[in-house]
């Protein structure tokens, strides 16, 4: 930190007193100088400029010594200055090890570094810096004008040489260039720049709108193409399902015919009843196993179809996310289209699942009906056999009854096993479907949650950008107001000059018109469409007879 004025004066007086008390030395050079700051500033040991000792207060030191059990008078030394007599404590070893000695400069540096400026203080400092800079620029400009006026008077009163003529010509060129740059700062030319910039912005905006429309058409065409692909895939899936149902119906019809033929065969061949029953059981087991295998294959096919649809939906979502990332600044409707498309896909998938569930239930009902018919036929056949056996065989052998009982017991056990196996299959299917539905629901919620987080993130970014644009607009308005105030003050200051400035204003207008025409020519030279150039010419109020075609 820099030293205070009092400290510098005190250091200087102390240094002079010490120099008078010291013996004189032989002078080597009268003009030699020594930078005393290299050896450190010499200052009296006042209370404010002395090294800062934490816990240096006498009362605090006494309390500390009392707490440590060392309550005795410390060793001191007397320091006599011109204005006071001070008694300094000779520092000893710190028992606590927590004391710290630092210089005032270091303490002030740490205190200054620990201070955090607020936003208002930063703005105030920036405003003060701008005002100071503007004042310096005004002072320098005024000084330059005075020096130029004096130089012009001096040059007009003397004859110029060839080199001076060349220098004068260069100076005039520089002055002309400076006047041109100054004219660039005029309000009319600023408005002209704004008009040209506005024309360029309109041209760029129209091009962007056209590009946006083309992109929207491409997106619509792509969406229609995807819808057509999904419709074709759906029709193919429906055809495959219809073909599969047709084959299953034919197979069930063949099974029914086989059962009817088997029943007729049983009626014709009563002597082989036991063997035929065993064959029927084996055929029924094979048929049930075949149905189970068909159910498993059907479940696997539905699972594969579902995985394909999910992969297709994921691919479409990834494609939409990529397009959304590329057109984030221009296309906000893309996200809504993706969400609607995803909802439609989910609705179609739900309809497909409902249709598959309905088909499965109808198939189970058909199987249950066939089993009921078979059991009914078997029961009826058993009753007929029993009546016929009762009529034809009055004397029944116990061994035959025992065998019949064993056969009936085996039949019941087999049917019980079949029912148990069927129930286990039904429970397994229901569990598998429930797990798959839960997974689909979790995946849908995850995608929906990610989309909501992305929408919230975009909304926050948009709000941040809007805040930045608002601050920038406020800053521009403030600068415009300051410029307007400066222009008003300049006009008030130049109003008293009267007629002399009238001709200058006329010349200034002519120069401004020339500069406007040149800028308009430069605008046309850039290749901007003629309608924007004509609109810029109309806003700039350039007369038609003087405009450049």
From Swiss-Prot:
Biological process per Gene Ontology, one example term: regulation of cilium beat frequency involved in ciliary motility
Gene Ontology molecular functions: AMP binding
Coiled coil segments of this chain: 119-232, 259-393
InterPro entries given in the database record: CFAP45, TPH_dom
Pfam families the UniProt entry points to: TPH (PF13868)
A GO-annotated cellular component: sperm flagellum
Tissues expressed in: Expressed in trachea multiciliated cells.
Keyword field: Cell projection, Cilium, Coiled coil, Cytoplasm, Cytoskeleton, Flagellum
Top-rank taxon, per record: Eukaryota
Main localization of the protein described in the UniProt heading: cytoplasm
Localization per record: Cytoplasm, Cytoskeleton, Cilium axoneme; Cytoplasm, Cytoskeleton, Flagellum axoneme; Cell projection, Cilium; Cell projection, Cilium, Flagellum
Cysteine disulfide links: none
Region (Disordered): 1-27, 391-416
Entry similarity comment: Belongs to the CFAP45 family.
The protein's assembly and partners: Microtubule inner protein component of sperm flagellar doublet microtubules. Interacts with AK8; dimerization with AK8 may create a cavity at the interface of the dimer that can accommodate AMP. Interacts with CFAP52. Interacts with ENKUR. Directly interacts with DNALI1. Interacts with DNAH11. Interacts with DNAI1.
PANTHER family: CILIA- AND FLAGELLA-ASSOCIATED PROTEIN 45 (PTHR15504:SF0), NASOPHARYNGEAL EPITHELIUM SPECIFIC PROTEIN 1 (PTHR15504)
Function: Microtubule inner protein (MIP) part of the dynein-decorated doublet microtubules (DMTs) in cilia axoneme, which is required for motile cilia beating. It is an AMP-binding protein that may facilitate dynein ATPase-dependent ciliary and flagellar beating via adenine nucleotide homeostasis. May function as a donor of AMP to AK8 and hence promote ADP production.
Record-given protein name: Cilia- and flagella-associated protein 45
Name of encoding gene: CFAP45
